[in-house]
Amino acid sequence: MQNCLGIYIENNLIKYAKVSKDRDTFKVDAFGIRFFDNLNEAIKKIVEETYSFNTPISINLANERYLYYDIFALLSKNDIQKTVETEFETFCDENKYNQKAFETRYALVSNVQNKERIKAIQVIVNKIELNKQKQYLEKHNLSGILPIGTAIASITRFEKKENVLIVNMEEKTTITTIYDRQIYNVETIDHGSQEVLEKINRTENSMSKAYEICKGTTIYTANVIDDAKEQPHLEDIIPTLYQISQKIKEIVDESPVKISTVYLTGTLSVINNVDLYFQEFLPSADCKILKPSIVELNVTQINIKDYIEVNSAISLAMQSLGEGMQSLN
């Protein structure tokens, strides 16, 4: 049996999930969230509490960027690699970046608009940021540092020919476009849970309380009477959700293929009726909370909402165990 501890790290919040794999069956053995002042101590306690002293640990990249290159499909593998390198050099020259300051990986996907071309998705991250993250885990068994924009797709299995968006509303929001089981695009926007939690924290003076307020908040849609007295922090939440909804709408409207489903996950997905809120802006797609297939395949007494809170951590563990995109070069 294989296992992995997925740890999703934000500015002052950790989400973790220990996942085991037996053949094609996955199981969540332990999970949770934790606010922290000292990241090293928080990781140490999570490792101790989950008995993960020798368990491989997978964490998320910090402040990564996604670049896209259009490449002729008939090129050899070596020529494709050279083309990606040349495109990245051009990007660095145009932006006056030091090329050697970045660690890079790329994956190749089909170009749905032109069958004679392929699309290279390149993930880049500053080496200083990357080394900082490695230092946090230097006393533990670090197995991988993964971009959450691609890892989140490993949380469930999509139908063939299904075209979807995964909107991961964490500290920042990543919107992952998937066409026919292939990741096609990842966009990151600054509007996300950090924006909301910081607003609530200004009056509540507690980030953990702000998080619980989000979990207890219900968004009233056009068909339900709004009782603002019972929802004092809606004014802190709705503006961020609106900005996210407009970005999703833009992506759906400009997509070269019809998006059938928009899956919602991340911290802001625990707000009650958030799927109904987004549905009002996206009548052509079905808006759903993203449930990990790992839960649907296993009988459990745990509330599905508790699992959804840590989807990002589950996805990091699952990708390290062989699910999702495995072809980053």
What is the meaning of each model-derived region?
Residues 52-65, 143-144, 256-268:
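Short glycine-rich phosphate-binding loop at a beta-alpha junction
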Residues 151, 288-329:
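Glycine-rich phosphate-binding/hydrolytic loop that grips phosphoryl groups
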Residues 202-203, 212-261, 268:
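Adenine-nucleotide phosphate-binding core of ATP-dependent small-molecule kinases
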Residues 1-31, 58-62, 157-195, 199-202, ...:
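Gly/Thr-rich phosphate-binding beta-strand-loop-beta motif of the actin/hexokinase/Hsp70
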Residues 64-159, 294:
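Active-site neighborhood for divalent-cation/phosphate handling
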Residues 25-51, 77-80:
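N-terminal phosphate-binding loop and adjacent alpha-helix
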Residues 259-287:
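Glycine-rich phosphate-binding loops at beta-strand->alpha-helix junctions
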Residues 130-152, 180-226:
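Glycine-rich phosphate-binding loop plus the immediately following alpha-helix
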